[in-house]
Amino acid sequence: MKKTIYPPTKKTIYPVILLALLLLVSCKSKKNMVASLPHPVLHTDSIYPDTTNAIAGLFAPDHSKLKALAVSKNKKQHTKKKETDTDADKSDRMLRGTQITSSSVDVSSVYTGVDRVVKYDFTHRDVPEAFEGFRIAFISDLHYKSLLKEKGLNDLVRLLIAQKADVLLMGGDYQEGCEYVKPLFSALARVKTPMGTYGVMGNNDYERCHDDIVNTMKHYGMRPLEHEVDTLRKDGQQIIIAGVRNPFDLGRNGVSPTLALSPKDFVILLVHTPDYIEDVSVANTDLALAGHTHGGQVRVFGVAPALNSHYGNRFITGLAYNTAKIPLIITNGIGTSKLPIRVGAPAEIIVITLHRLTE
């Protein structure tokens, strides 16, 4: 009797794909896990698995275990060189002026499309008194209509509204097709904040729909920043938001918009890829925000087959520093690319509360 062989269905193909990815990770893990990180990178003493979500949080770092870290604003990028004891002592003297603590809250049982809210308390001497307690919501890499669908988008909007942020910042890679631009930003426009909504473009947005995205954002009262800066004012004081245009085109955009700013201002740099703050000088920046990496999207024991960064795991997720010790927060983002799968890289939104350092 001849046996009939049926093609795999969607229900069976995803486990097969996931198994193949895990095998790929195991083949690459030795090389990735022994790679040394460039100096200086600050580490926490311990990293613990996030067990709040059995799938999305598998093997992911638990941000609630992060300890307070101290760094400083540095006005110049330094040429990479071999580390010496003198260099290390100099670096230690610079680690003051900023304190950063972090925690995370699992929301996957209440909201679809987002697994957790990661909260940072960012204390810095240049934060104006009027901005004490100022709340920043940061999202990136929605890739709308990949893993994130209409219900997830509506839940994301509800979650953002619940954060009661003073400003919403967005890191790019918004869509998986131009037909999704208007419904995406129409939904995000329901998030009302006192200081408005700002966004930069990601590589996907430059490949397609760029003008449509820019015009749609403006239509809904949002501000796209393409190598531009804007000033947020409150009670006679101010902070600066700077946005980078296509950070992959360094020939055109290799001069950071922060270079023309005053060192006295508190400056937040919004850029799609974290590599930019290491590739070029971003002097005068107090805090950089980036996405692009998806946190690895599929990570097992901290190792991912695709890192989306030239610097490996150094700029994969969470809190990091460039060589000039400028702090950078990298979000896992929300959507996915290539495959609608996340393992060990929970979809997240970031909420940062600013505090003024008093000595």
Question: Positions of the model-derived regions?
Answer:
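Bacterial N-terminal signal peptides
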Residues: 15-24
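Extended active-site neighborhood of metal-dependent phosphoesterases/phosphodiesterases
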Residues: 97-98, 104-109, 121-123, 186-250, ...
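Membrane-embedded segments
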Residues: 113-115, 127-215, 219-223
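Beta-strand-turn-beta hairpins that frame and shape the catalytic cleft
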Residues: 115, 123-137, 222-223, 230-243, ...
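Active-site neighborhood of phospho(di)ester-bond hydrolases with catalytic His/Asp-centered motifs
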Residues: 139-140, 167-173, 196-203, 225-228, ...
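Conserved beta-sheet core of the metallophosphoesterase superfamily
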Residues: 189, 274-353, 357-359
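Short beta-strand/loop segments at the ligand-binding rim of alpha/beta enzyme cores
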Residues: 257-270
